[in-house]
Amino acid sequence: MARGDFAFHHSFRVRWSETDAQGVVFNARYLDYADIAITEYWRAVKFRDYADGAPMEFHVKKATVTWFAPIKPDEMIEVMARTIATGRTSMTQLVEIHGLTEDGSDDLRATVDLVSVHVDLDVHRPIPLPDWVKGVFTAFDSQATNMQSSLAEA
């Protein structure tokens, strides 16, 4: 996807402790970066506020990392996230990790596809997503630059 396909963006600097002996970000850290992206994305969406105190707990069912180019220590990166599907008990969210370029050009380093299942923590079994979940993420994601352009053209 293009940067304009995402309403949510968050940037941060890669710490030396996140790199390995090869001088690049250690492979497991890509999932840490996806977790940061999803945490900040949900905060931006105000997801927990909509829950009105109800427990909204999720387990990651599947995480797929697709690597494109290395990330180096002390580099600024930008993570983007959006919801690409909602099911009866789960959400699929896409995270893109880019090098943060001065001109805003695409510098895709990796993508992470996450399937998260809404669970009852007492029994660790899937439970249905509340009806409002899809609408909250759809409304937020529709603020993406490319989404607004598509809506204006329609």
Regions found by a protein language model. Name each.
Residues A2, H9, W67-M76, I84-A154:
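HotDog/MaoC-like acyl-thioester-processing domains
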Residues M1-E40, A44, A154:
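Catalytic strand-loop segment that frames the active site of acyl-thioester-processing enzymes
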Residues V25, F58-V60, R109:
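A broad, structural micro-motif
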Residues A54-P73:
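Small beta-barrel nucleic-acid-binding modules, principally OB-folds
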Residues V45-E57:
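Short, solvent-exposed helix-to-loop capping segments enriched in aromatics
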